[in-house]
């Protein structure tokens, strides 16, 4: 998947800022290099997820950027997203691939080489690998695997590895050197005073 954008933005409604504002700011800078992953709180309704995803899809379409929906694959299908992303507690990878179809983008969370290899064999298009650093963006995460952990996974698979977990622009060079194709961020953009400027800094680091 060489055409996959290197910068992934995961939406965050907890930041006190409209996630659509952050998405628009990031898209205006990153354009096709941005992949927006629509993620809502566990207690959000499917209707809420659908409404947000539909609006994000409309924004992404203006820039020919990719939009995925995390966890709720039925919502991804309903809004016509490019695909989805599943974690350890979601549908098995093979089942997710069957739901989305062979042409869809399917991201899968993996934290070790064995899980990564199995995910790719079952149909993963790319892997979200981490957390690189301790993070509070999601409850119940395992300990951070660090840059070295990302490197172990990247060496084991041929699909793009997207590093995640409190990643900042300063982390990008060492993550890329370890084998990461790109990075996924939440707070680095959602909490930024200037999301467009923060996007530019991340892109500059990613395209060395």
UniProtKB/Swiss-Prot annotation:
2-[(2R,5Z)-2-carboxy-4-methylthiazol-5(2H)-ylidene]ethyl phosphate binds at residues 135-137, 166. This is Thiamine-phosphate synthase. Mg(2+) binds at residues 71, 90. The lineage of its organism: Bacteria, Bacillati, Actinomycetota, Actinomycetes, Micromonosporales. It comes from the Bacteria. Pathway: Cofactor biosynthesis; thiamine diphosphate biosynthesis; thiamine phosphate from 4-amino-2-methyl-5-diphosphomethylpyrimidine and 4-methyl-5-(2-phosphoethyl)-thiazole: step 1/1. It is an enzyme of class 2 (transferase). Condenses 4-methyl-5-(beta-hydroxyethyl)thiazole monophosphate (THZ-P) and 2-methyl-4-amino-5-hydroxymethyl pyrimidine pyrophosphate (HMP-PP) to form thiamine monophosphate (TMP). It catalyses: 2-[(2R,5Z)-2-carboxy-4-methylthiazol-5(2H)-ylidene]ethyl phosphate + 4-amino-2-methyl-5-(diphosphooxymethyl)pyrimidine + 2 H(+) = thiamine phosphate + CO2 + diphosphate; 2-(2-carboxy-4-methylthiazol-5-yl)ethyl phosphate + 4-amino-2-methyl-5-(diphosphooxymethyl)pyrimidine + 2 H(+) = thiamine phosphate + CO2 + diphosphate; 4-methyl-5-(2-phosphooxyethyl)-thiazole + 4-amino-2-methyl-5-(diphosphooxymethyl)pyrimidine + H(+) = thiamine phosphate + diphosphate. GO terms for biological process: thiamine biosynthetic process; thiamine diphosphate biosynthetic process. PANTHER family: THIAMINE-PHOSPHATE PYROPHOSPHORYLASE (PTHR20857), THIAMINE-PHOSPHATE SYNTHASE (PTHR20857:SF15). 4-amino-2-methyl-5-(diphosphooxymethyl)pyrimidine binds at residues 37-39, 70, 109, 138. Keywords: Magnesium, Metal-binding, Thiamine biosynthesis, Transferase.
